[in-house]
A protein has these predicted regions:
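C-terminal accessory/regulatory regions appended to core domains
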Residues: 1-170
């Protein structure tokens, strides 16, 4: 079984974390376990170093992203984002998704429009991320954290579609 990412990177298990401390702890641990330090060791020690390095990298990538961190915290609480009881999407967000998709399709060749759309979506994403801390404070609020996290996953996909469209323009 893999170690808890928060424990592995020596930071408190919470949604709000100190990113600088996370980064410093990550770098410090990587220096200790990096495979280059084990070049003269036996094959087993080398493989263990590679395995630990991969786990630390995974932990760091997960915890530095607010959305991945939210998903991980929900998982630690035994909650699955893809559980049927959490898959319903609020009507207003569904309408927003459709509107963004339509705007993307209609303006896929308009760089300035897509940049503005990306900016507007980034603002919405930040607003939603800022809601998450309160939903992780109390266990009974975790279903709301699931809802927000699922919506954030959609927003990330939408951002990627816009990014791809902008690349196509160039």
């Amino acid at each position: 079984m893999s170690q808890n990412f928060f424990k592995l990177l020596q930071i408190p298990e919470a949604f709000v974390i100190d990113i600088e401390t996370l980064h410093q702890n990550y770098q410090s641990i990587q220096k200790e376990i990096h495979p280059d330090r084990f070049a003269s060791f036996n094959q087993e020690a080398k493989m263990e170093s590679v395995k630990k390095t991969a786990q630390v990298n995974d932990a760091y990538q997960t915890l530095k992203s607010p959305i991945r961190r939210a998903e991980y915290l929900l998982e630690l609480h035994g909650l699955n984002l893809h559980d049927e009881k959490y898959t319903a999407v609020p009507q207003d967000f569904l309408m927003q998704q459709m509107e963004w998709r339509e705007e993307l399709e209609t303006h896929k060749d308009n760089k300035s429009y897509l940049e503005k759309l990306a900016h507007d979506i980034a603002i919405k994403k930040d607003e939603m991320i800022n809601l998450l801390p309160r939903y992780f404070e109390k266990k009974e609020m975790l279903p709301e954290a699931i809802k927000i996290t699922r919506e954030l996953n959609f927003i990330e996909k939408m951002e990627q579609h816009i990014h791809d469209a902008l690349i196509e323009i160039h």
